[in-house]
Structure formats: C-alpha cells, structure tokens
Amino acid sequence: MSTQRKAYKNHSKRFSNNSSSSSNNNSSSTELTSLLEMFPDWESDDLSSLLAEHNNILEVVIDLIVNNKVSKWEPIKKEAKNKKKEKENDEFVNVPNTNVTSNNTTHTSSADHGHKLNKYHKEAHPSNSKSKFSSKGPHNKKPNPKFNGKDSSPTAPTTSTSTSTSGATSVPSSNSWAAALSKDGVKVNNKSHKESDSQPETELEPEPEPEPVAQAGEEHEIIIEQTTTVIESTETPTSTTKPVLKEATVPQPKQGSWASAITPKPKSKPRTKQALSGSQEESFESKGQFEQAQEEPVEAIIIEETTTTIPAESISSEETIEQPAQVVLPTSSQPLSSVGVSFGSLSLGDEEKESQPEQTTEEISAPVGEQSQQQQQQRYGLYNNQNQNQNQNRYNQQIYQQQQQHAQQQHAQQQQQQQPQQSQQSQQPQQPQQPQQPQQPQQPQQPQQPQQQPQQPQQPQQQYNQSKQQQQQQQQQYDYYNQFQQSQYPQQGSQTLPGAQFGVYPGMDYSAYNQQAAAAVVSSPAASPAATANYAQYAQAASQPPSSGAQEGNVAAQSPITSQINPNTLQQQVPAAPFGYPYYNYYYNTPFYGNGAGLGAQGGFGNVAAAQGTPTSNSNVTPNSGVNSGFMGVGNTGASQYYGQPNQFGNRYPGYNSYPQPGQAQSAQSGNPSNNQSGSVPASQGEANDSSSASNQAGNPQSQIPQQSQQPQQPGIPQYGGYQQYPQYGGYQDNNQYRGWY
C-alpha cells in the first residue's frame, strides 16, 4: 500500500516512481529512521520524499519540518490516523463480524470501496475479488472507522458494511471495527448479516430487508455513515459517485478521512429517500449513469447503488440524501436556483421537512425552470417598470429635459419627440412649472444658439437663479448629461455657458460666481471676462484696435459690451470654456478664460487692468457683434483663438508676450502700453490696453494672431504663477485653481 500510495498520492515527490523513491529511501534509510523517531506523527513516505527532495540532508529536512515550512500530505495524515484505527480494527477483527457485515456493508463498503479506489486505483478494481478486498479490508476500514467511530454504535451497522463491499470475506474485518464501535449496529446487522451472507455480493437485496429492520435511530445513523462513506466516495474520483448520489445524505464527515475533510459538506439538500425512492432513484440512476460513465471502473459500487436505493425506500423517511445537491448541479443549473431546499436548514432533523421540497425539486424542477423564468420575467418586468418609472421620475425631475426640450426644440426636435414621450408624463405634472421654467431655463439655453445672444443679456440672473434652484431641487435625481448643453460642439452652445453649463456642474455652484462676476463687471467689466458679454464681443473688442488708450478708457461707455453688461446678462456672458473643456492652465493660453476668453481679446490673461472699469473691448466690438454668433462668439478669430496659439501673443508664455521687458513690466503694471501705443495708460487701462492692443493688431481677427506675434510686448505684466490677472474669476478663484499645473 505504502509504495503505491507514494506513487499515487505524493505528487510532490520528485521521485514519483516507487523504484526511485525506494532507492532514495535506501540511501537515506538512516536519515529516515532518525526522522521517523524525531517526528513520529510523520509517515515514512512524507519523510522519505522530503529527504529525496533535499538530497538526504537531514538537517534541512528537520529545519523545514520544525518551522512548518513543510506539511504532511493531508491524505497521508489521515491515513496515519486510519492506520491507528486499523490496528484497533485488527484487534476487533475477531469480533463476530459475520453478524454485522453484509447488509450495511453494501453502503459503506461501496463508499469505502470507491474511496480506496480513488486512493489506490491499482487495488480498487481488483477489490471486487474477495481475496484482495479482504486483505485490504483494514484499509477500507480506515475511512469509515473514523466516521463510524464518530457515528459510534448507530453508524456502525452502515460502517460495517463499508468493508463488506467485496463480499462476506470483508465482512469480518468490517464487523471488527463495527463491533467495536457499535454493538447495536452489530445486533441489527446480525439479522441482516444472515441475509447478507446468503447474498454477500448481491448485497442489493439483503440491504432493503435489514435496513427496514434497522431501527429509526439506526436509520439516522445509517444516514450519517452513508454520508460519510458517500463523502469519501464522492471525493474519490474513481469511486462511483452513484452511491454518493443516493447516499449523499447530509454528509457529516467526521474528520475521519481526508476525503471527508476535503469534501464540501453538502448539507444544503437533505432529501428523504422516500422522495428519492421514486423520482430520485430514477434521477439518480440517470445521473448515476451520468456519473457511471465517469466512475464505471468500480463495479461493486454500481451494485451498491441499487442497494442504497432499495434501502432508501425502506429507510425513505429518514435517510436524507444530499445527492440532489451533487446531482442536480450537473443536471441543470436552473432547478437549483428554484429548488425549494433552503440551504440554511441542514440538520438531519430537517430532513423530513425538506423531504417535501426534495420531492418537489425533481417533480418541480422542470416547472421550476418555467417558474423561475416566469419569475425572472416578472422581475425583469418589474425592473423595466421601475426603470420606466425611474426614468420618468428622472425626466420629471429634470428641468433640464424641459429646458432641453425647449433648447432641443431649437437643437433637435427629434429628441423632443423622444422626450415628450418621457416628458409628457413629466410635463403633465410639471406643466405648471414648465411655463415658468421654459421661460426661464429655456431662454438661458436658447441663447446657447448664438443667434439668440441678444436675448441673453435680457435674462436676469434671478431667472437663472430660480431655474437653478429648481434644478437643484430636481437634481436630486438627474440624468447627468442632460444638465449640460446638448450642443455636442462647444462652438454652438458655448455662449450660454455660464448658467447652462458651469452652473450645472454637479459639484460646483457657480451662481455666486455669476453674481460676483455681474457685480464685478459693472465696476470693471474687463475685470471679469463676464464683463465681456459675449465671446465674440469680448474677442472682437480685443480684435479691434483701440483707437487710443483714451478710447479704451471710454470703452466702458462706448463698448456694446459694457452696454450689454447687465449683471443679469453677465451670468450668461461670463466667458467660460464650452462644456467639458478642462479647467486647466493651458501652456499657452487658457482657451476660454482670461486671454482665452476672447482669445485675442485682451492682452495677457483677461487683463486685470481693464478691471478698473474700462472694458478693454472697444466700441469697435459691436461691428463684430454680428460675428458673435460665430465660433464661440469669437467669430473673428474663430478656432485659431479657440485653441491657444503658441505664438498667439507673440510669445508662447501666456502672461507676458515676450519676457517682460523691464520697461514693459513696469508699464505693464503701471499701465501696459496698449501694444505700447497707449503705454502710458494707467495699469487698470494698461491691461485693458494690452488686451486691446492685442485686439488692435487683431483688428482683423485673422490678423490677430500674427499681430499678437508682432506684439511680443502685450501684457508687460508678468503674469507668473500667480495668474492673478485672471479677472474673469472676479476674485472668485484667485490663484488656487492653477496651482497644480506647473
């Protein structure tokens, strides 16, 4: 056994061959003996394999073992225990084994038989012959004696059967430990044993009689051992799982065998064999056949399956078979989900309770699949209904849909067609709101289209704030993207930006910012790019050269920007990147802020100097206002300014067109020479001049970029890391947002 066990089990042994291992054992015999003395709980197989792996260096092996770096093979550990029990069993072998043996032996013997088949393929098949099996009888006893020892006397009748699989020959051995473990089982088996002796190999027939004879207590015990034997048989690959299928009663593996330890303990589905006797035996046979193909090599076990099924009829009430759990899984996954067996109740006491679901499981399994499908359909139906309701709720709660619907009336009426369906419900409850909201939010989104920009200045922030409050109320559930302008392209809707887009950013409330911007704009329209009512006007004012710094000073009055600037309108006009534009500091320009706001618009970053009440935008802005509807409202410079141009301001570095010349740095701060033309303009106007100077050369938006390149000087103001010249933030966000970007 040991050598075969080595070859079969110790996969770790590099010398899987018995011969090689034996030779190694010979060379390391002294080390082996010393190790065996030092570690009596280890088997020679393990120790010899360790020695072989470590070149028979005793110290290394001892170190590994002592430090738990090496562990015994579990099956061998348990077998070592089994050997101890075998010794006990050998002592009991002389006990009247014949009394107990055959009837129960069929169950456990089949399980044990299969179990050892797993361990020892070589011996397992010949085990059908009585001679080999009887010789192996003590080994067969090993796994079961553990279980039986735990099962104690009640289990003994079944355990005694474990050894008897081969036939009456094994019976004495099985009776030995069985007799030791349980004499009650022996008594019952004495009756059955007479029958079983008559039919030791046809064990099928004797079992049904003795098991019905078996007492109820023993029936539970039988169930227990069957579970144990079944556990082993289940785990032994060659062992016929059929007995497992039928006998996989609530497995109570009792540490006895590695198989029991390894086997997941399927207590989930104890089935009474009454149900099994009819439908389950059929299913088991079909499934058993399924597994027979796998485990056919064991013949005696197949016989025993029939035996187990017969006792199932006899013991039907109490032998719970968890087989369905093992069997049902291979057959179909759905019935498992639908199976009535609750995995929570696993105790044997629940067997009877669960026998009904067990019966129903097979009976119901087919309808269960149907029911489960129906349930799924119902669930999906509910889910769909819920989704519809939720979607409707979302849309109901989305002012944006309504805004979008109106904005989309402009942008896409197709979407309206879709949304009215969704929003019709939303509109009906909210129609009282819609007349308000569409008026208010619609307009901010209508201005999304540059054509409606003139309306934008007309809309007060109050409406925006109201709509925004409504939005906030209804943003509790909102479709994330509905918030944003539906214009897929920033050029289109960018002009409504501040309210429609940034105001809506989920994490940020820009309402205060817009208000501040509006206030700041009045004081210094250029100070906040909001002051530049439209990108187009903003950039165009910049693009058009200020006739003089004086004009720039007057620009506030002259520029349509300032005229347009109502704190109400400013909210919409606050230059901001179209939706989704990152808020980064672009290396050249932040496209939609400061410089970027009109990108050619005002010298450096939205020149702060302009903040002093002179919007840098010139009266010239209005002639370009037609362009406002153009790209980003900066119709002139168009995309070129939309993206920061490396040379746009004559220098890659945004704040100072060229490295600030000392004169410019002074003048930039004192007052940037607008393109050095209005160099004397006070700093407040100076930056405005810078931007305007940029706009001077940008008089033609096309020319702006080269002109800017011509004006390396624009904002002498070195707008270094501080970027404090971003008026567009109205002081709202100082330097902090740019801190990380160097």
Curated annotation (Swiss-Prot):
<dbReference type="InterPro" id="IPR003892">
    <property type="entry name" value="CUE"/>
</dbReference>
<dbReference type="Pfam" id="PF02845">
    <property type="entry name" value="CUE"/>
</dbReference>
<feature type="region of interest" description="Disordered">
    <location>
        <begin position="79"/>
        <end position="494"/>
    </location>
</feature>
<comment type="function">
    <text>Recruits the ubiquitination machinery to RNA polymerase II for polyubiquitination, removal and degradation, when the transcription-coupled repair (TCR) factor RAD26 fails to efficiently displace stalled RNA polymerase II. Also involved in telomere length regulation. Binds DNA.</text>
</comment>
<feature type="compositionally biased region" description="Low complexity">
    <location>
        <begin position="371"/>
        <end position="494"/>
    </location>
</feature>
<feature type="region of interest" description="Disordered">
    <location>
        <begin position="642"/>
        <end position="742"/>
    </location>
</feature>
<feature type="compositionally biased region" description="Polar residues">
    <location>
        <begin position="681"/>
        <end position="700"/>
    </location>
</feature>
<feature type="compositionally biased region" description="Low complexity">
    <location>
        <begin position="16"/>
        <end position="29"/>
    </location>
</feature>
<feature type="compositionally biased region" description="Acidic residues">
    <location>
        <begin position="198"/>
        <end position="210"/>
    </location>
</feature>
<feature type="compositionally biased region" description="Low complexity">
    <location>
        <begin position="224"/>
        <end position="241"/>
    </location>
</feature>
<feature type="compositionally biased region" description="Basic and acidic residues">
    <location>
        <begin position="79"/>
        <end position="90"/>
    </location>
</feature>
<keyword id="KW-0227">DNA damage</keyword>
<keyword id="KW-0238">DNA-binding</keyword>
<feature type="domain" description="CUE">
    <location>
        <begin position="27"/>
        <end position="70"/>
    </location>
</feature>
<feature type="compositionally biased region" description="Low complexity">
    <location>
        <begin position="152"/>
        <end position="176"/>
    </location>
</feature>
<dbReference type="GO" id="GO:0006281">
    <property type="term" value="P:DNA repair"/>
</dbReference>
<protein>
    <recommendedName>
        <fullName>RNA polymerase II degradation factor 1</fullName>
    </recommendedName>
</protein>
<keyword id="KW-0833">Ubl conjugation pathway</keyword>
<dbReference type="GO" id="GO:0003677">
    <property type="term" value="F:DNA binding"/>
</dbReference>
<comment type="similarity">
    <text>Belongs to the DEF1 family.</text>
</comment>
<feature type="compositionally biased region" description="Low complexity">
    <location>
        <begin position="336"/>
        <end position="348"/>
    </location>
</feature>
<dbReference type="GO" id="GO:0005737">
    <property type="term" value="C:cytoplasm"/>
</dbReference>
<keyword id="KW-0963">Cytoplasm</keyword>
<dbReference type="GO" id="GO:0043130">
    <property type="term" value="F:ubiquitin binding"/>
</dbReference>
<dbReference type="GO" id="GO:0005634">
    <property type="term" value="C:nucleus"/>
</dbReference>
<feature type="region of interest" description="Disordered">
    <location>
        <begin position="1"/>
        <end position="30"/>
    </location>
</feature>
<keyword id="KW-0539">Nucleus</keyword>
<keyword id="KW-0779">Telomere</keyword>
<dbReference type="GO" id="GO:0000781">
    <property type="term" value="C:chromosome, telomeric region"/>
</dbReference>
<feature type="compositionally biased region" description="Low complexity">
    <location>
        <begin position="93"/>
        <end position="109"/>
    </location>
</feature>
<keyword id="KW-0832">Ubl conjugation</keyword>
<comment type="subunit">
    <text>Homodimer; may form higher order oligomers. Interacts with the large RNA polymerase II subunit RPO21; the interaction is direct and serves to bridge RPO21 to the Elongin complex in a manner dependent on transcription stress. Interacts with RAD26.</text>
</comment>
<feature type="compositionally biased region" description="Low complexity">
    <location>
        <begin position="299"/>
        <end position="324"/>
    </location>
</feature>
<feature type="compositionally biased region" description="Basic and acidic residues">
    <location>
        <begin position="110"/>
        <end position="125"/>
    </location>
</feature>
<feature type="compositionally biased region" description="Basic residues">
    <location>
        <begin position="1"/>
        <end position="14"/>
    </location>
</feature>
<feature type="compositionally biased region" description="Low complexity">
    <location>
        <begin position="663"/>
        <end position="680"/>
    </location>
</feature>
<keyword id="KW-0158">Chromosome</keyword>
<dbReference type="InterPro" id="IPR041803">
    <property type="entry name" value="DEF1_CUE"/>
</dbReference>
<feature type="compositionally biased region" description="Low complexity">
    <location>
        <begin position="701"/>
        <end position="733"/>
    </location>
</feature>
<keyword id="KW-0234">DNA repair</keyword>
